[in-house]
Amino acid sequence: VLWSREDDMAHDFYRPASYHRISGAVDAQGQIAAWKHRSTSTSIASWWDRAKPAESQELGSTLQMPYLMKNYKLEYAPADSGVPRAWWRSVEASFIGFVMESYMDELAHAAGADPLEFRLRHLDPARAVANAVDPKDSNPLVCARMRGVLQLVASKAGWGSKLPAGQGRGIACHYSFNSYAANVADVIVENGKLRVERIVSAVDIGTVVSPDGARAQVESAVIYGLTAALKSQITIQNGRAVETNFNHFACLKMDETPHIEVHFVPNDLAPTGIGEPGLPPVAPAVMNAVFAATGKRVRRLPLLPDDLRA
């Protein structure tokens, strides 16, 4: 049986939706005093097995918080939906990375701190965080390695240099699939229109077995992440998907693709994942750059055409 693209997009599985509400505070010393994260999402696990409760995977790296803070509270409630759903590149990290790193940026500005310095301030190089999602996983999140990708990407991107009016630079990092990734995004916002000029990525995946293949994976993750953040949206009306082809469900085109730089942290540790970890920091780096350029916070994806015109 040969399906048309319209048939395929109308009857395929879709990326889960999620909603997050975060509140927090910083103290007089500029340290995070509290972080409360409430979220709900349409569970992948419960779609495939209705008798199975939403798995802890939906919480992802919220259960493996890299940033040191005095009080951290996490609440989750599964949301039911009749929309068929399944895995998408980087799974729950694709939206959790956006949420966590966007809010980390908001806390940095609330503290009057540089976003890079604020992140480093809360990453204790002597600290390792066990995997609460999978107790059998012997690979903890090593904060020193997260610091390493942040420092490398900042150095390569020229973090701290002054930009002209209407331009912004944002930073974000995330840990997934036992790998560490950080992005710096440079954007231009003019007359309510956004153009991403450059993405610099730094990744720590242990020993890089195939440099060309690994670099291609990160570059494609950037393009995937930008497509999802800036264009991809499925809307459901009368029980069916409205968008059924690429004229309505657009992908990032070649002339819209920014200059992409990829850098790897050199080490001789065991190789870890590379196909997905490059994606989660893309959207928050871009939207943090949008804030730097415009003073407007983007808290919903994808970014719609009118979001920056208001």
Where do the language-model regions lie?
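Cofactor-binding beta-sheet edge motifs in enzyme active sites
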Residues: 1-310
